[in-house]
Regions:
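Gly-rich Lys/Arg/Thr-decorated short loops/hinges at beta-loop-alpha junctions or inter-strand turns
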Residues: 1-3, 40-55, 74, 119-147
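N-terminal amphipathic/basic leader segments beginning at the initiator methionine
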Residues: 1-25
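Gly/Ser/Thr-rich loops at beta-strand to alpha-helix junctions
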Residues: 13-14, 39-41, 84-93, 176-182, ...
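N-terminal glycine-rich anion-binding loops that anchor highly charged ligand groups
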Residues: 28-46
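Catalytic or ion-translocation cores adjacent to nucleophile or general acid/base/metal-coordination motifs
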Residues: 102-119, 184-225
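Flexible, glycine/charged-enriched surface loops at secondary-structure junctions
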Residues: 106-110, 217-232, 276-295, 352-368, ...
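A conserved active-site cap/scaffold subdomain adjacent to cofactor or substrate pockets
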Residues: 201-307
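C-terminal non-catalytic interaction/assembly regions of soluble proteins
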Residues: 304-453
Length: 453
């Protein structure tokens, strides 16, 4: 058993810094590279791509990342764990295998492919069997929107990743695993933590929670003393140095920008935390109220004292469904009286839509630069140098939303003076993909692990 296992984060979302994975494997010693690509809306995007082309449906940025880190995997034994499989883990694995062969590393990768989280093809069967997949916020059954569902994926835990590592995989590709499982799984594998080692498992979850968003815990998007954080253009992504007892240090590679401090780690700890006594995952429930966070040197933070308890018998399910259409148009009004001009344009546009008989589920106006973020707390903004009118509509009928998009440009000549920001053309109509969170019994979600070479 290793005394210390180093897990580095290389992606915090699909669209993150493309060069970060390479920097993490080249910047210093690590054992595992964790790449987190998936968010709730990402699954529906990937499902649409797969519908158009059955060979797609995964985070294609991962394939390029694998090409950049391939030497580290082959020569230094760094292992890769990523949820880049999206709704098509086998296709993702095939693409990675092809990259390895193209780069002269045929047979060097043992790719673990985790499937079973995708419930889209089983929805009708599950509903008929008494699993209503009720919305966690409203209590409504999924049957209300079943005909508009785009994707449905259960959040799976660390067990299938641990299984893949146990079968000798040096690259593990999952679909909708929890973000935290990508870090906890290698620790559980290396330290042989048992299924009821609640405190150690909870420590793995907290480690994963801290680094799952990439550089957000190493100086990026940090509110505390943000002006003094150095060299964010070369920000160092985080890594954890974990021990068998569950304690770990959060740090980053030397000669990189950003900062790892008690403040940066603490800000990330409370990100999407929910109940601090019960941070629920498929593997364990972690208690965040017992955590100790202490400085352990420059850019080093020691995390300890973590407690855990048994998980529930449910898994969370992320469902995405079609919910109509939207369009957003913008115009910029400048001083003097910028806000007053934008407000007049808003009234003109609303009256114009009413006269045309256009009806929408919602019309939303924001005055960016005046009160879009702080609302009535913004204070007197009558002397703002410029204000952007941001006018959006949503509704079930695409044609009605499309008609709205033709009403923004006429305001340039027919509305208040001192207007700019209209050179981008008419607003685009976009389909709305809504989120439906639900729970399902763990017993009905069966994961499968295949290892290909």
């Amino acid at each position: 058993m290793k005394k210390v296992v180093r897990v580095a984060a290389g992606q915090g979302f699909w669209g993150d810094d493309l060069d970060a994975p390479r920097r993490q494997v080249e910047g210093g010693p690590i054992d595992y590279l964790m790449l987190d690509y998936l968010a709730e809306v990402t699954m529906s995007i990937l499902q649409k791509q797969k519908e158009r082309d059955p060979s797609l449906g995964y985070a294609r940025d991962f394939v390029g990342a694998m090409e950049s880190v391939l030497p580290a995997v082959v020569e230094r034994g760094v292992k890769i764990i990523a949820n880049a499989g999206g709704v098509n883990p086998p296709a993702c694995a095939a693409a990675v295998k092809a990259v390895a062969e193209k780069n002269g590393a045929k047979g060097a990768l043992r790719i673990g492919v985790v499937s079973g989280d995708d419930l889209l093809g089983r929805l009708d069967q599950l509903i008929a069997a008494g699993h209503p997949l009720a919305n966690m916020e409203t209590g409504e059954p999924l049957s209300l929107v079943r005909d508009r569902v785009l994707s449905a994926n259960a959040y799976i835990g660390s067990e299938p990743i641990v299984e893949a590592l146990g079968k000798g995989a040096n690259v593990v590709i999952t679909g909708r695993s929890t973000d935290t499982a990508l870090t906890m799984a290698p620790l559980r594998h290396e330290f042989a933590w048992g299924a009821t080692s609640w405190d150690q498992l909870a420590a793995g979850i907290v480690a994963g929670h801290i680094i799952e968003c990439g550089a957000q815990c190493s100086g990026g998007n940090c509110l505390y003393d943000w002006r003094s954080i150095p060299d964010l253009a070369n920000v160092g992504y985080p890594l954890v140095e974990a021990k068998p007892d569950g304690t770990f240090v959060v740090t980053k590679h030397p000669n990189t920008g950003g900062r790892v401090s008690v403040q940066t780690v603490s800000e990330q700890l409370v990100y999407e935390m929910g109940d601090p006594h019960s941070y629920i995952t498929p593997d364990v429930i972690a208690d965040f109220t017992t955590i100790s966070v202490a400085r352990d040197g420059d850019d080093r933070v020691l995390v300890s004292g973590i407690k855990g308890k048994p998980p529930t018998d449910k898994l969370k399910v992320s469902v995405a469904y079609r919910a109509g259409f939207k369009a957003v148009g913008t115009l910029v009004y400048v001083w003097p009286d910028a806000l007053e001009k934008a407000q007049l344009a808003d009234r003109i546009l609303r009256e114009r839509l009413d006269r045309l008989g256009l009806r929408f589920e919602r019309i939303l106006t924001e005055f960016v630069g005046a009160n879009a973020t702080h609302g009535h707390l913004a204070g007197d903004q009558r002397n703002a140098p410029e204000v952007q009118l941001r006018f959006g509509v949503r509704g079930p009928d695409r044609a009605t939303v499309e008609r709205f998009t033709r009403e923004i440009a006429p305001l340039v000549l027919n509305g208040p003076p001192s207007v700019t920001g209209f050179a981008g053309g008419r607003p685009k109509v976009e389909e709305i993909v809504a989120y439906w969170p639900a729970l399902i019994d763990k017993s009905v979600v069966k994961t499968k692990v295949d290892v290909i070479q």
